Amino acid sequence: MSCMACKIKGKASNVCKFKDTLTPVLEEIAEADGLVLGSPIYFGDVTGQMRTFLERLAFPWLSYNDYSLTAPKRMPVVLMETMNGLPDRNNSQDYGSMEHCIAAALGQPEHVYAYNNYQVKNYANYELGSFSEEAKRQYRDTHWKEDLQKAFDVGKRMAERICYGL
């Protein structure tokens, strides 16, 4: 199936026409009231899997007639990122060019960041010599409640926007 199947005259679609296990998810998003997306950040960007998902989600919204981006409906969006970087020292590019597509089609997203991730239970079992397990644990223990509160607060704002049409 061509990646242009969603653009066939008279059969255009706002959902990717390629049928697989992602199809029902994309169909549900088209009817959703809000969307939360999350990705670890590797090499300053979202994962390849997230990028592929976002392309499958957003490409059908793109019109090659006028280059507009039109989703089935607008909705609150939250973009979450986890990374090894710190607030003052990270190379995250957020959701890159796909964030523009999300903002244009769905609405301006809110961001939630979780920094300096404590990645594994026992650092001694992995080739992670540049990290201090103790420093990672201390950072997590110090910031965990704050990270949970940020996630709660953004979820609350999303629910208010959905319920009250803000």
Region roles according to the model:
Residues Y42-G44, G85-L86, Y118-Q119:
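Short, catalytically relevant binding-site loops at active-site mouths
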Residues M1-Y67, S130-L166:
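N-terminal beta1-alpha1-beta2 submodule of the flavodoxin-like/Rossmannoid cofactor-binding fold
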Residues C3, N91-S92, K121-Y126:
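Short aromatic-enriched loop/helix-cap "lid" or pocket-rim segments at secondary-structure transitions
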Residues G48-Q49, L62-Y113:
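Short, glycine-/small-residue-rich phosphate/pyrophosphate-handling segment
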Residues P109-N125:
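Short, solvent-exposed beta-strand-terminating loops
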